[in-house]
């Protein structure tokens, strides 16, 4: 049984992956993919409307791959889209985002993904192992 302590890094932007990997970390404990989306300045729906779902998936794969390549063969844990509604409202296409008293506790994360995308979300999440 391995009882050693693992040191994992959190990464918000793929461009930080190489520097983070050079620290000798044992992998990525949290890759925040919402920052990949926020950097496009469009909500996922608006990005897909403008560029198509294939381009959206390719954008995510590009960012995740940069991190996965920098840390290979170490583990990379990816968090699904977790931006709060107030951050989405600031993006192109964010006009329809709900106004919430406390966006940090509201419509976000897995709740948002399952409500908006249901079974598609579950099926597509399994593709992360292919990155």
Label every PLM stretch briefly.
Residues 1-131:
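Conserved alpha/beta-domain cores
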């Amino acid at each position: 049984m391995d009882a050693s302590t693992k040191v994992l890094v959190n990464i918000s932007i793929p461009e930080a992956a190489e520097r983070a990997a050079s620290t000798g970390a044992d992998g990525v404990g949290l890759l925040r993919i919402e920052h990949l989306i926020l950097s496009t300045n469009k909500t996922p729906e608006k990005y897909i409307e403008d560029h198509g779902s294939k381009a959206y998936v390719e954008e995510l794969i590009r960012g995740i791959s940069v991190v996965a390549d920098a840390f290979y063969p170490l583990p990379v844990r990816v968090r699904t889209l977790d931006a709060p509604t107030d951050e989405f409202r600031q993006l192109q296409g964010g006009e329809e985002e709900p106004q919430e008293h406390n966006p940090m506790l509201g419509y976000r994360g897995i709740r948002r993904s399952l409500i908006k995308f249901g079974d598609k979300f579950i099926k597509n999440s399994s593709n992360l192992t292919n990155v």
